[in-house]
Amino acid sequence: MANITAAMVKELREKTGAGMMDCKGALNETQGDIEAAVDWLRKKGLAKAAKKAGRVAAEGLVAVESAGHHAAVVEVNSETDFVARNDAFQAFAREAAKIALNTDGTLEGLQTAHFPGATETVSEKLQALIATIGENMNLRRVTKLEVKKGVIASYVHNQISEGLGKIGVLVALESEGDVDALSALGRQIAMHIAATNPVALDASGVDAATVERESNILREKNAGKPDHVLAKIIESGLKSYYKEVTLLEQPFVHDGSKTVSQVLKEAGSKVGGPVTLTGFVRYALGDGIEKEEGPDFATEVAQQAGRA
């Protein structure tokens, strides 16, 4: 039997919202496999459909920079929140986002770009900052969005300084309508994305493995039903899943009576032209990164005193 730890139970509870004993039982049944335990709980009706989410444990900042028809978002990690509040670290994150506007939007392109006012590349500048501050840091990821006509709207949640925070969102709206009205609409949608964390724009963007996983869960939960009935249950279940996790089908957080798709359709008459949402990106600090938990306070003190 697998060794089931309290940390494993805690992680499963955070992912599913299921009770402690249910989580422990699921882990025992699946030999400690977290993802298999999620499915086991869902098949038993003990957990809701879970979006893809990793444990958020890294520190640092998400930085957003917009310039007309293009915008960029970057994530820079540090070991501690203390360093994330350092002026030099914040200046680096902000400048990295600005530099990303003039790159190809890839991480390598940003790392090798020239850092303004210095002889180094962005990567070399970060290494110099690490040497100065004395803590490991990482330029983790970057995304750039562009539109031909319209706006790239942005929103930063838990903002600690202009364009810097814990969650950064970009929304690309293609339209020939009024720019100010588009920007206001885009910001509302960006706030919606920050709150709901959709996995794709529409059903076509949900990866095949996820669709197969959802189908299998529905199939096992309804085992024994006639094939024609089961097919309808799976079809209905997937529609419900798409409404939960795809942006255009989600109920709009600012008006739950409408979907985001409906809001965009109605916006055309207000902004002076059809509006198409062509893309979005949501960065949550440390998304998917696991960090080792340190010793408790008493153990840490004992270690420092040489007694452990």
UniProtKB/Swiss-Prot annotation:
Family annotation (Pfam families): EF_TS (PF00889)
Keyword Protein biosynthesis in record: yes
Main location per the UniProt record: cytoplasm
Keywords per UniProt: Cytoplasm, Elongation factor, Protein biosynthesis
Subcellular location: Cytoplasm
GO molecular function, one term: translation elongation factor activity
Record InterPro entries: EF-Ts_dimer_sf, Transl_elong_EFTs/EF1B, Transl_elong_EFTs/EF1B_dimer, Transl_elong_Ts_CS, UBA-like_sf
Involved in Mg(2+) ion dislocation from EF-Tu: region residues: 80-83
Cellular component terms per the entry's GO annotation: cytoplasm
PROSITE patterns: EF_TS_2
Role according to the record: Associates with the EF-Tu.GDP complex and induces the exchange of GDP to GTP. It remains bound to the aminoacyl-tRNA.EF-Tu.GTP complex up to the GTP hydrolysis stage on the ribosome.
HAMAP family linked to this entry: EF_Ts (MF_00050)
Membership in a protein family: Belongs to the EF-Ts family.
Name of the protein in question: Elongation factor Ts
Source organism per UniProt: Methylobacterium radiotolerans (strain ATCC 27329 / DSM 1819 / JCM 2831 / NBRC 15690 / NCIMB 10815 / 0-1)
